[in-house]
């Protein structure tokens, strides 16, 4: 969100992160999905909510998985949408898209909206409504523009364990 910035953490080297992920090497990230899960639990605690229905999309789906695994008594139900379990062999981005997404120039404030639209066009496929998404992307960029934060989030995802076996008990 808008409350904490990690400028001192620097910018992850995304090419190194991607290659390390491909070859199963350890990835050092400024923070982890478990850290973000702890933050989410902190919000529930501050609202005095002991147990909740959790829903998350994409990285949010991974975060709710971490909560369900590590704090099952806090979860009424869990819904993980457009996400995966951390198994590098399944549920990732299609290989044909990786070359189009990795190594692209970092967006500037001026190019951020169109870059976001293009990224989602590549992921969504032929039925993507660019104009509708452009409005959403503009709202996102107007709220907060921090490409380094996105890179740190991608590093957090890449550095996280495979949760497949652990999720079978949820």
Would you name each region that the model predicts?
Residues 65, 69, 76-107, 149:
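Flexible "cap/lid" loop of the alpha/beta hydrolase fold
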Residues 54-56, 81:
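Short beta-strand immediately N-terminal to the catalytic nucleophile in serine-hydrolase-like folds
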Residues 21-30, 34-52:
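Conserved acidic catalytic loop of the alpha/beta-hydrolase fold
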Residues 56, 60, 64:
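Gly/Ala-rich beta-loop-alpha elbow adjacent to hydrolase catalytic centers
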Residues 169-170:
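Short beta-strand/loop motif that positions the catalytic acidic residue
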Residues 94-165:
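Alpha/beta-hydrolase
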């Amino acid at each position: 969100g808008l409350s904490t910035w990690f400028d001192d953490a620097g910018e992850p080297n995304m090419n190194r992160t991607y290659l390390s992920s491909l070859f199963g090497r350890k990835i050092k990230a400024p923070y982890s999905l478990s850290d973000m899960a702890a933050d989410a639990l902190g919000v529930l605690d501050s609202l005095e909510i002991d147990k909740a229905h959790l829903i998350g999309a994409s990285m949010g789906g991974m975060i709710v998985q971490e909560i369900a695994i590590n704090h099952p008594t806090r979860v009424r139900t869990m819904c993980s949408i457009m996400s995966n379990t951390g198994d590098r062999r399944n549920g990732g981005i299609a290989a044909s898209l990786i070359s189009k997404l990795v190594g692209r120039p970092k967006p500037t404030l001026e190019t951020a909206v169109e870059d976001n639209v293009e990224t989602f066009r590549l992921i969504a496929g032929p039925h993507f409504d660019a104009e509708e998404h452009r409005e959403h992307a503009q709202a996102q960029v107007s709220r907060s523009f921090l490409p380094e934060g996105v890179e740190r989030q991608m590093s957090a995802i890449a550095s996280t364990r495979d949760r497949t076996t652990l999720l079978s008990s949820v």
